[in-house]
Amino acid sequence: MGSFSIWHWLIVLVIVMLVFGTKKLRNIGQDLGGAVKGFKDGMKTFEEPKEQIQQSSATAEKTVDVQAKDVNK
C-alpha cells in the first residue's frame, strides 16, 4: 500500500481535469514546454563561450615575454 497503482493516478488525473479543465492544463503544458526550450537555448549560449575560452588559452601559450626598454632619455 506504500505506492500508488495506475488506478489511483487515473483518478487523480480525472479530478485535476475536472478542477482545472483541459484548456488550462494545455496552457500550463505549453508554458512549461516554452520554459524548458528557453532553458536549453540558454545553456547552448553558455557553452559556446567556453569553447572560445579554450581556443584563446591555446593562443595565449604562444606569447613571448620581453623586457621593455626605457625610451625616455
Swiss-Prot record:
Part of the twin-arginine translocation (Tat) system that transports large folded proteins containing a characteristic twin-arginine motif in their signal peptide across membranes. TatA could form the protein-conducting channel of the Tat system. The chain crosses the membrane at residues 1-21. GO terms for biological process: protein transport by the Tat complex. The Tat system comprises two distinct complexes: a TatABC complex, containing multiple copies of TatA, TatB and TatC subunits, and a separate TatA complex, containing only TatA subunits. Substrates initially bind to the TatABC complex, which probably triggers association of the separate TatA complex to form the active translocon. One of its GO terms (cellular component) is TAT protein transport complex. It comes from the Bacteria. Residues 62-73 have a biased composition (Basic and acidic residues). Gene3D superfamilies: 1.20.5.3310. One of its GO terms (molecular function) is protein transmembrane transporter activity. It is found in: Cell inner membrane. This is Sec-independent protein translocase protein TatA. Keywords: Cell inner membrane, Cell membrane, Membrane, Protein transport, Translocation, Transmembrane, Transmembrane helix, Transport. Residues 50-73 are annotated as: Disordered. The keyword Cell inner membrane applies. It is a single-pass membrane protein. The lineage of its organism: Bacteria, Pseudomonadati, Pseudomonadota, Betaproteobacteria, Burkholderiales. Its main location: membrane. Belongs to the TatA/E family. NCBIfam families: PRK02958.1, tatAE.
